[in-house]
Amino acid sequence: MPNEVDDFNRFRAELNEEILNCGHLGIKRFFALDNQAYDPGPLDTRTKELLGLVASTVLRCDDCITYHLVRCGEVGWKRDEVIDALNVALVVGGSIAIPHVRRAFATMRGIQGLQPDVK
């Protein structure tokens, strides 16, 4: 059954393809730079995704938060680890980040490995 995360991923893939096919070199270069920033270096990709989630939350970018939550699930972060990172984002970002943390929790419901335990 499709969910909001599936819809987000489809929309993102479709629009990224359109953007990258528009022929603008600057846009292509920026997308490449953004992608390469998460390649392993002194920090591994897994850590960089968690940093991306924190930065996205502080900056209050819901699409970015969703993307990094999906990636955090893919690279093996556990729900409690992601919640701990969201706590850091909340402390850095302040109370204005609360609605974005709330949406992050809602989004995690649809991500394998980040879903709440059913009790």
For every predicted segment, state its role.
Residues 51, 55-67:
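Short, thiol/selenol-centered motifs that function as redox-active sites or metal-ligating centers
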Residues 91-96:
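Glycine-rich phosphate/pyrophosphate-binding beta-alpha loops
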Residues 67-79, 105-108:
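Iron-sulfur (Fe-S) cluster-binding segments and ferredoxin-like electron-carrier domains
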Residues 38, 59-60, 77:
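Residues in soluble alpha-helical coiled-coils and helical-bundle/repeat scaffolds
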Residues 1-49, 97-119:
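Acidic, glycine/proline-rich low-complexity segments that act as flexible tails and inter-domain linkers
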Residues 82-85:
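Membrane-interface alpha-helices at helix entry/exit sites of multi-pass transporters
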